[in-house]
Amino acid sequence: MHLFMKFSSKPHFQSTIILIYQMAPLPAENILPIIFLLLIIFSVSKAELHAHYYDQTCPQVEKIISETVLKASKHDPKVPARILRMFFHDCFIRGCDASILLDSTATNQAEKDGPPNISVRSFYVIDEAKAKLELACPRTVSCADIIAISASNVVAMSGGPYWNVLKGRKDGRVSKASDTINLPAPTSNVSQLIQSFAKRGLTVKDLVTLSGGHTLGFSHCSSFEARLRNFSSLHDTDPSMNTEFALDLRKKCPKPNHNHNAGQFLDSTASVFDNDYYKQLLAGKGVFFSDQSLVGDHRTRWFVEAFVKDQSLFFKEFTASMLKLGNLRGSRNGEVRLNCRIVN
């Protein structure tokens, strides 16, 4: 008996899987396991992300999200950096499942209220996009996909690369503040960063590349002031910092500091997505200890130097790493939330 099966990539499969079985006639009890195997393969294929996921069910999804993000960014220039950070923090914990959007309840403290996420902002942008999508395509587009598409939009509109976002994520039903301890900290050294990224299947190259997202970033003093005073028994200021840069930061972050909005942009072209972040690191002007440590370790420095020399290389690698980050999957039992802040 010849059994031929073909699973097409249209409309919901990223790749074509062809299974050809050549066998003699089999009794029914031997055919059932084969059918079961094929059903499993079919299910896995169906779960794959792909660029055309909403082509039939919500063809205007990209337009609605991009218009919403652009409008918000014009009103508040910090939106691009906030959306990009939101995407990273969401994917890094439970996979890209929009768990960062869920509000805390009387019985559960959610991710957004965990210490590293207290400063994550601009959730309203995702809320607005979701509301518009529910009117246009009810119960169709996941909040997780909205974050992913928004992240691509903010990079492109800031002068960075554009990539066609793979879609089809589901929204998770679990969000715990305690899980945020797994996020990389601005005080982490290279070994800690490498270990943290490796747990999520991300390489050293992904680490250095995704750190380049800080080209749009801003930090409040609390995340780096430990580098400015009483750094160690030998040095008052972190010796890896440029001396003049350290003095400038001390002025912006005095002790005591009564300005809770005080801080520093993470590179000198904060509204433009470029390779200036890496140039600042080579000049000793990395704001976070974790950032500056990338040039002090042979495992990461050569990536920094390569991106300084070739911005197009950085853009290419950033696109690849963002797609890889976006493929970190959440729960297989997810849903499409009607409201991004609460489970259905």
Regions found by a protein language model. Name each.
Residues 1-22:
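Intrinsically disordered, low-complexity basic segments at termini and long loops, enriched
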Residues 19-344:
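Catalytic cores of secreted/periplasmic or lumenal enzymes
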